[in-house]
Amino acid sequence: MNNLKKFKYLAIGLAALLAPAMCSCDDHGYYDMRSPENMIDDKVPALPEVADMHTYKAPLYWSIYEYMREQGNAGRPADECVFTLDQWIEQLDWMKENLLPYGYDMVCTDGSGTMKALDGSPYMTHHSDLPIKEFVEAAKARGIKVGIYDNPWWIHCDDDVLIPGTQYTVGSLRYDPAIDVVKKPGQKDIWHEIAVPTHPGGREWIDGFFKHYHDLGVSMIRMDFLNWFEDGFSRLEKEWCGPGYGRAVYAQSLAWCAESAKKYGIFLSLVMPNMYNDAELEAKYGNMTRIVGDTWNGTWEFTSSNYRGESWVNWPACRNQFDGFTHWSHIAGKGKVILDGDFTRLNTYANNNEKEFVISIQLMAGGPIAVSDRRSMIGSSLSFYQNKEMLALNADRFVGHPLDDTLNSEGSNIWYGQMSDGSYIVGFFNRDDKPRDMELALATIG
């Protein structure tokens, strides 16, 4: 190899880690993951190409997720789990001082509370009592962008409201057993009122959704519950959550979302996708796609130990971040979809080694960092989010890959990639509870 190439090493683990530059990749008896199967059960229509879809770097931002979850766990009503405008202003001021200087330039809402379309609007104007317009203006005044948790396949307004640019009513987009072929006829959608975008006016409905948020100044849409829309059945809940509108409707609807998001300059974050057929749709039409189940309580369990080494053919394919990044690493890279490891709650981790690990694997994989610690809980964990040496990977749009994307293989613990200046970054990740040796021959990576 070229002796002029520069290398930097990250040694990350729960315990001390040695990294001599020689090759050793014994399997330790770990078992391989199962690749996703082709789960398409209906014909997918001819779909558009969306040029220059993957031009973004992974976002660095703060999410209200932890606050919502902990308020809900404490028994608060859903509308009290959402920040008021005054609470958001306090958070934005804290962001401006503590995270914005390090590249975290966005905040994002999440899924608790009531989504309201007021004053005849077809689309959400208020999140519980939070006026989105004023919220975005307050953020913009501080140099901070806003992401909104919403989905163009959800209905928040009255049925008699007209779809923008058409004479169709929003109610005409609802499931119609006379024309919609679904997986479980008669099953109602839970939690959300669903629009079926393949009905007449559906394309205009989706385009109007993204125009609405563009006009408000929103930068990202976090689009959730994709697997419930496509399949109707949840493997985790072990129950039907909706009729399941099928692969063809999902594919066409997602393609339209991508077209409109690109048209209006909105970053499209896909959440809870099945990723069937090797993520052929999500990798094509999402700027970013989730590769692991929900953060929930955080901790090392979410990052590494939960169902370690196991994978499934539908959402979620993996139940911990490290496996998710490994499993889906082959679809990521510069000019490709961004892998999303969900929210980070550093205050839930047991020690500094764990905190270093969770930040490092996300940045090594080219993923975002979505800080979710509350101001009252973040404490000394803040410094791990402010690590300029690690954040340089994000600024450079670095995307690394494991030596081996087989779950629990020795090679899956060694990640590497190149910076734009030609230097190599190598990360050694120890997922075990005791020190261990890792070795790498530099010729292996270039």
Indicate residue ranges for each PLM-predicted region.
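Alpha-helical scaffolding within the catalytic cores
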Residues: 41-50, 90-95, 129-133, 204-209, ...
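Active-site-proximal substrate-binding groove within the catalytic cores of carbohydrate-active enzymes
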Residues: 57-63, 258-446
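Bacterial Sec-dependent N-terminal signal peptides
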Residues: 20-44
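Acidic (Asp/Glu)-rich catalytic clusters
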Residues: 50-55, 96-101, 137-141, 214
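N-terminal carbohydrate-binding/catalytic regions of secreted carbohydrate-active enzymes
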Residues: 59-132
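Bacterial N-terminal signal peptides
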Residues: 11-21
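Aromatic- and carboxylate-enriched substrate-binding clefts and catalytic-loop regions
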Residues: 106-341
